[in-house]
Every structure is written in C-alpha cells, then in structure tokens.
C-alpha cells in the first residue's frame, strides 16, 4: 500500500503541533499531569504521540471508511476548516471550562454533533466516531505516562469520549481529503 507522504506528513505535523498545544492547556489547567514532565509540564514524547495518533489514526479512518463502503463525497475545505477550529475550541474548552464533568460532557457532545453534521452526517461516519470515542479513552486509560487529575472511570474523565467524538470526524474527514481514495486493489493513488 502506498500513501501520499505529503498527506501523512501534514497529518503528523497537525497532530504534533496543534494537539500538543491543546494538550498543554490540559497540563496548565491541571486537567492532567505527566509522570515525567520535560518542557512546560509535558513529556518529551507528547508531540510524537499526537503526531502519530493523528497521522496513523487518519489513515486508519480512511481504510475503515473504504472497507465499510462509506460514500465517496468529501467535505468542502471550508467545512473541514470550520470543523478543525471547532474541534480546537472544544479541546481547549474541556480544560478551561470551570464546570462539572457532566456539564463538560454535555457541551462536548453538542460540539461533536455539530462537527459530525458539518463534515459527515453518514452512518459510516457515525460508526467511526463511536469507535474513536471508545478507543481513544481506552488508549489514555492504559497509558502510564500521565494521569487525568479528576477521573470518573478507568483513569479518565467522563467527558473524554465526547472529546474524541469531536476529533474523530474532523481528522478522519481531513485525512480522507488529504490521503485520497483507495483503488479497488487496495492501493493509494500516489499523485
């Protein structure tokens, strides 16, 4: 399988920069703490983790979309840009809002619905969003390198699945636009 290196690099850079900066909001608002902080309270590996999660997660989304028979229609660049901005706002809000975990859950769930209908709105996308909302928090729950400081269940706060539900359609649909469509043979166009 051949993946456009430029698309993969864009997704990696987006994750390594944007999501690391957003994660630093969680560090500075004492939403989470790293076991071995390196710079500004974050671990040295955070940009690598965020970059890999965004790039490999985006490619996995494209593969799953194709395998599940998702429709070929792509979101517009404007819709994707708006979804990414709203995702960043929701991520920041999850650390900055001085409210209960339940209120954060409600706000993030509403944000996830807006993002989902902005760039997707399909059954395939709903299944993938649910997969992201389940798998993301599990990955955080088993990562010993940091702790959420107000966990509700399995080392994570109750609003974390809703945050992943915000991120999944925005990054997944961006990846579909950047990576391209798989050919029938399972190969990616390299142009």
Residue ranges of each PLM-predicted region?
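Aromatic-rich, lipid-facing transmembrane alpha helices and their immediate juxtamembrane interface loops
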Residues: 1-191
């Amino acid at each position: 399988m051949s993946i456009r290196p430029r698309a993969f690099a864009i997704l990696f850079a987006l994750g390594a920069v944007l999501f690391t900066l957003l994660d630093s909001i969680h560090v500075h608002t004492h939403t989470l703490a790293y076991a071995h902080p390196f710079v500004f309270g974050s671990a040295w590996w955070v940009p690598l983790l965020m970059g890999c999660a965004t790039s490999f997660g985006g490619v996995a989304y494209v593969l799953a979309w194709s395998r599940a028979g998702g429709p070929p229609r792509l979101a517009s660049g404007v819709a994707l840009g708006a979804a990414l901005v709203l995702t960043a706002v929701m991520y920041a809000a999850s650390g900055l809002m001085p409210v209960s975990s339940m209120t954060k859950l409600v706000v993030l769930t509403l944000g996830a619905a807006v993002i989902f209908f902005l760039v997707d709105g399909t059954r395939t996308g709903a299944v993938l969003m649910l997969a992201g909302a389940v798998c993301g928090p599990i990955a955080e729950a088993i990562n010993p390198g940091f702790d959420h400081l107000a966990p509700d269940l399995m080392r994570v706060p109750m609003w974390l699945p809703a945050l992943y539900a915000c991120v999944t359609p925005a990054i997944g649909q961006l990846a579909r636009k950047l990576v391209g469509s798989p050919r029938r043979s399972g190969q990616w166009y390299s142009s």
